[in-house]
Amino acid sequence: MRSKARARKLAKSDGDVVNNMYEPNRDLLASHSAEDEAEDSAMSPIPVGPPSPFPTSEDFTPKEGSPYEAPVYIPEDIPIPADFELRESSIPGAGLGVWAKRKMEAGERLGPCVVVPRAAAKETDFGWEQILTDVEVSPQEGCITKISEDLGSEKFCVDANQAGAGSWLKYIRVACSCDDQNLTMCQISEQIYYKVIKDIEPGEELLVHVKEGVYPLGTVPPGLDEEPTFRCDECDELFQSKLDLRRHKKYTCGSVGAALYEGLAEELKPEGLGGGSGQAHECKDCERMFPNKYSLEQHMVIHTEEREYKCDQCPKAFNWKSNLIRHQMSHDSGKRFECENCVKVFTDPSNLQRHIRSQHVGARAHACPDCGKTFATSSGLKQHKHIHSTVKPFICEVCHKSYTQFSNLCRHKRMHADCRTQIKCKDCGQMFSTTSSLNKHRRFCEGKNHYTPGGIFAPGLPLTPSPMMDKAKPSPSLNHASLGFNEYFPSRPHPGSLPFSTAPPTFPALTPGFPGIFPPSLYPRPPLLPPTSLLKSPLNHTQDAKLPSPLGNPALPLVSAVSNSSQGTTAAAGPEEKFESRLEDSCVEKLKTRSSDMSDGSDFEDVNTTTGTDLDTTTGTGSDLDSDVDSDPDKDKGKGKSAEGQPKFGGGLAPPGAPNSVAEVPVFYSQHSFFPPPDEQLLTATGAAGDSIKAIASIAEKYFGPGFMGMQEKKLGSLPYHSAFPFQFLPNFPHSLYPFTDRALAHNLLVKAEPKSPRDALKVGGPSAECPFDLTTKPKDVKPILPMPKGPSAPASGEEQPLDLSIGSRARASQNGGGREPRKNHVYGERKLGAGEGLPQVCPARMPQQPPLHYAKPSPFFMDPIYSRVEKRKVTDPVGALKEKYLRPSPLLFHPQMSAIETMTEKLESFAAMKADSGSSLQPLPHHPFNFRSPPPTLSDPILRKGKERYTCRYCGKIFPRSANLTRHLRTHTGEQPYRCKYCDRSFSISSNLQRHVRNIHNKEKPFKCHLCNRCFGQQTNLDRHLKKHEHENAPVSQHPGVLTNHLGTSASSPTSESDNHALLDEKEDSYFSEIRNFIANSEMNQASTRTEKRADMQIVDGSAQCPGLASEKQEDVEEEDDDDLEEDDEDSLAGKSQDDTVSPAPEPQAAYEDEEDEEPAASLAVGFDHTRRCAEDHEGGLLALEPMPTFGKGLDLRRAAEEAFEVKDVLNSTLDSEALKHTLCRQAKNQAYAMMLSLSEDTPLHTPSQGSLDAWLKVTGATSESGAFHPINHL
């Protein structure tokens, strides 16, 4: 409760001291102070002494009364000791004052008065100042006190006493003259004490002098090397500040106030500096003492009228900028640049850099002007300064926060652990962390097709989903063929809307073992067929439309083309006899009723919009992962399911019979299948084995054009495989580069159908009974008859027929069958073959060559210049084209997208080695089992479990042989960096990177020294990069470090520089292929001489394989280093760069899978390329004279050839002379040709040369040959 306070009117005279220096605003101070002080609280009335008039007359004293009164409000709740009282002060306009009620002797101490320092005050003219109702004032007391020192340093103290804690001390007023002073003040820490300096009588007011206040101890000296001193004239005692000197003179020097500081704390006593020995330089203005004249002259600047350098945080001003900077350091301690090599601190990074250069030789002298961090090189500083730039290209897709460095973004992403899966796919419900990963997933999503039928499709063509898309309907007879992509790679998103092929039914489709090798958005593709009314016809329309024959022949009925577009599409391909009647009747009717549907589908036959990113999908691409526009193989099963979806188009069978007759079109199931279809279901798929051989072999065809195929069709017969790879989706290959023959490009129309039963064979009639002939081909060209396989003939239809996987079977199937095989394989012998299903001969008179198709074929994006000069030789010189075909480097080694095949087939290869352990579940094979880096024909449960136990990345689907590899790879997605440097704040995802960082950065180890300039480097890659500069300076190749000379006199880079050679592969690619072409052209003209050279070269190759400088001898070291480099690039490089895309023979996958093969004992069945070279070394008499082997390895791995390929690139990078290049390229070409031959001959026994060279090649390519033996090619 507040109560009224009594007020008196003070006397006012005409002599108001308006100009009094102690009262600049008398009315404001007087009235407000009284009011506010009276508002604090209430107490009982205090007797007020006689009013004190203004000291304007000698008649009046502060103790005398005054006839005038002014209103003074006395607070009633001030806790004041009994020895004192509050009443009207004798100082005019000061308000209340403290008056003594008892006698006080000198030396008594009052206090403390707790205050809080402040940095600003209203007035700077007064030593003491009371300001009421100020915003900076303590809210409960309302008083701010400013204490100033005449040298310009001020300290402001706000009364911080709580209510009832001695706040009465603030009412001690300032005396008008020094004679009236009876108190002095001293500050200890944040407390103020009052000391009585002379006796105070009762009724006398307590006063201090205006110039005597609580002064801080000293000021900042102008220079750090000088100590300011002040000398007493009487006793020659030195003091640190003028305040100390004045106190000394007033209270201690002489008899005046000698006992002033007795009883006070030792801190209050001035510390004398002792008598100075020598002449002292004193400032006449401020009496400061300096040790030398120069210091005094520097000091005299401060006494000028105007100070140019003013502090923006306090009222201080300086004449020297250095003093201002030094002073500002006291305000902001964070702007200090400390030397890392000594204790000095600098305010400017340039001074720090200058200091390091002059005092610390070799230290990091490049300092950042923003943060002061130092770097050893200017490039390091430049890279660091990106942190302070405003450009932040790396944006978090979750919270959209941007960063200047990719590593910072990766580190930031770890903060989103709780929201990394907040973006949901609206179709399948799968969660994703970023929009880019969601967009990537939607291309493969299982929910529905996200791509409208445009571009390669006819406009407006509806895409009807297949009933097989339902994941809840797995086939009861699920086995390997139906275990598609997701069975082998359970976590890899299956390319849902990725088209396998955009060709009409004449084009084979990519089989389900390797879906989505080429994403649809990777390369632009023009429409393969122009939109026509035929393509725009509605689905399920019953028009007997005809597909325009691209071969220039009479148009075929669409039903004819479509019925054979997918082997197993119709029930006519049923495996059992009870379905044969439907093969003849109902199935053909279904096809007729869906003729327009098939015609539409023919334009996107292999658009496998397998929508499956569902990691739980178990049926894979073989069944439920068929595309929305693909066929549903179930709809054509022999059980008569309704045809609701669109058929799976692939290499079908051209029907024998009238081209316009739909009813006479019997559709046969091709024998070219690695897995016979089960009884319940016929799926239009083939195993991954067929896919890999067809894909790889067809890619090989791609690089040599149709020239060899024309010769093959005329003279050699068909290859042992059919071109089933969708080169319409290869990157823009021109028409002249298409590897398919005209017949191969029109599989569904041009390939002969095989009768499935005697009754089907009789339906063909005439010569077609022995050899069903294709009406779409011209009968003037005759193809040779392929030899019958050596295996046993097929048993009767009632018996169980083992799989026929021999090369001869593949060759026959490529002629007779379509490009599609059953998606379901046969595990336990339930597949029953008809008597006519054995091994029918192929009619030689029915296989003419067809004119080329005239579809729009894009051109390759990086191979165009290679084939500009080679195409002319292919048709005129078949043998030369054949050599050119196989002597070229394997496309898998260079095509960036082929690394996907390498990755997928590598994982499938391990299944081959397990076939010996699962013999109880596998039937004996009468022929040599075909196993080209693919799973065996049947997979038992342990095999399937082993396939699922692969360590698969859940983000990108990559598969790793060990969990450690997967763990390290996952850090590239999550950004996790668990290895932190103990010396700095950097962290790493790989421990080896941390060790290298500590070794190079902190330990300053530089073990790699350039022998040309003696410069040292911390990493081998830096040394290699440095050596390239010497190469440009025309340094001899033999002097380059990392380059070893082999037996041929050529050079190859050491493994440590292999990564740099990979980086230059793209630049050297054109020259590389150009040299190969030139070499092949020369070898064609000098066959006799090259035969001798190649014998010698092969021996040298065998010797060079043992050279310690080759990468094959140090693969483990290279693997570890490459892994580290790749991981580091994933973390710190710019986003979007991929190591695997720039270098086709990616070192990391190769090394990873080699480790996997080392772990699996069963993989020892695979005969590597090194073993091939050892075999050749045993027989030095011939180029490829190998000892007879009963069976060749089941896991032939072209990776071994890829490992050798880097030697050629290293040779190119070393810029060797042309002669040495020819030798090396010859060796590499022969190695790869040998690898290709082995890939096609696999289990064929190898003998010494005993037959003509052409016959050997014919045998390799599956053409007519008298012997099953494989012969070396010494004549090439």
From Swiss-Prot:
Region feature Interaction with CTBP1, CTBP2 and ZNF516, mapped onto this chain: 679-1038
Molecular functions (GO terms): DNA-binding transcription activator activity, RNA polymerase II-specific; DNA-binding transcription factor binding; DNA-binding transcription repressor activity, RNA polymerase II-specific; histone H3 methyltransferase activity; histone H3K9 methyltransferase activity; histone H3K9 monomethyltransferase activity; histone H3K9me2 methyltransferase activity; RNA polymerase II cis-regulatory region sequence-specific DNA binding
Top-level taxon in the UniProt lineage: Eukaryota
Ranges annotated as C2H2-type zinc finger: 230-253, 281-303, 309-331, 337-360, 366-388, 394-416, 423-445, 951-973, 979-1002, 1008-1032
Any one biological process term the GO annotation gives: negative regulation of granulocyte differentiation
Coiled-coil intervals: none
Keywords of the record: Activator, Cardiomyopathy, Chromosomal rearrangement, Cytoplasm, Differentiation, Disease variant, DNA-binding, Metal-binding, Methyltransferase, Nucleus, Repeat, Repressor, Transcription, Transcription regulation, Transferase, Zinc, Zinc-finger
Keyword NAD on entry: no
Bias (Acidic residues) ranges: 1116-1133
Tissue-by-tissue expression: Expressed in uterus and kidney. Expressed in both cardiomyocytes and interstitial cells.
Record carries keyword Nucleus: yes
Xref: Pfam families: PRDM2_PR, zf-C2H2, zf-C2H2_6
Amino acid composition bias (Polar residues), ranges on this chain: 561-570, 1047-1058
Every SET domain range: 82-211
Phenotypic consequence of residue 291 to L: In CMD1LL; uncertain significance
Record text on subunit structure and interactions: Interacts with CEBPA, CEBPB and CEBPD; the interaction is direct. Interacts with PPARG and PPARA; controls brown adipocytes differentiation. Interacts with CTBP1 and CTBP2; represses the expression of WAT-specific genes. Interacts with PPARGC1A and PPARGC1B; interaction with PPARGC1A or PPARGC1B activates the transcription of BAT-specific gene. Interacts with HDAC1, SKI, SMAD2 and SMAD3; the interaction with SKI promotes the recruitment of SMAD3-HDAC1 complex on the promoter of TGF-beta target genes.
Biological function: Binds DNA and functions as a transcriptional regulator. Displays histone methyltransferase activity and monomethylates 'Lys-9' of histone H3 (H3K9me1) in vitro. Probably catalyzes the monomethylation of free histone H3 in the cytoplasm which is then transported to the nucleus and incorporated into nucleosomes where SUV39H methyltransferases use it as a substrate to catalyze histone H3 'Lys-9' trimethylation. Likely to be one of the primary histone methyltransferases along with MECOM/PRDM3 that direct cytoplasmic H3K9me1 methylation.
The protein's name in its UniProt record: Histone-lysine N-methyltransferase PRDM16
